[in-house]
Amino acid sequence: MDTKLVIIPTYNEKENIAAIITAVMNLPLGFHVLIIDDGSPDGTAAIVKDLMQTTYNGRLHMIERAGKLGLGTAYIPGFKWAIEHKYDYIFEMDADFSHNPDDLLKLYDACANQGADVAIGSRYVSGVNVVNWPMGRVLMSYFASKYVRFV
């Protein structure tokens, strides 16, 4: 059986964390979740710890970091942890539902069943699909993506 891990970095995601974890855990393929919490002062880590002990024992994991170290640096210990624990498939997503958890199924299918070594989701395939972002952030992200492809 192949193992699948979703890495979710968090900072002050108390309002979303239980819902995003539940959404991923309820998917049919048995995903595991690794939360990388940057010392959220709002109690995000406490919610995750409770879910680890009561609801998702063995499938929910957490790395707590001291202080807000940033999104990019959160993925490094997450990927190292996934490799150390020999996960076959590693995914990353945001805690605020700006990524649709159902898309994990499509990404998994691309790698497991269609022969892709890497599958990358984009908010800009088939139009812009961004949730909970102000228009300025959407435009900046969209044009930054276009610029990177051009360069």
Model-derived regions, located:
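Acidic helix N-cap motif at the loop->helix transition within catalytic regions
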Residues: 15-19, 42-51
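Conserved hydrophobic residues forming the short capping helix/wall of the S-adenosyl-L-methionine
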Residues: 28, 48-53, 82, 111
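N-proximal low-complexity "stem/linker" segments adjacent to membrane-targeting elements
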Residues: 1-23
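Short loop->beta transition adjacent to catalytic acidic/histidine clusters or analogous donor-positioning motifs
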Residues: 2-4, 25-35, 43, 59-60
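Acceptor/aglycone-binding surface of glycosyltransferases and processive sugar-polymer synthases
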Residues: 63-84, 89, 101-151
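Short beta-strand/loop segment that forms part of the nucleotide-sugar
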Residues: 21, 30-40, 63-64, 93
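A conserved acidic beta->alpha catalytic loop
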Residues: 37-46, 97
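Residue-level signature of catalytic and energy-coupling elements of molecular machines
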Residues: 17, 24, 78, 96
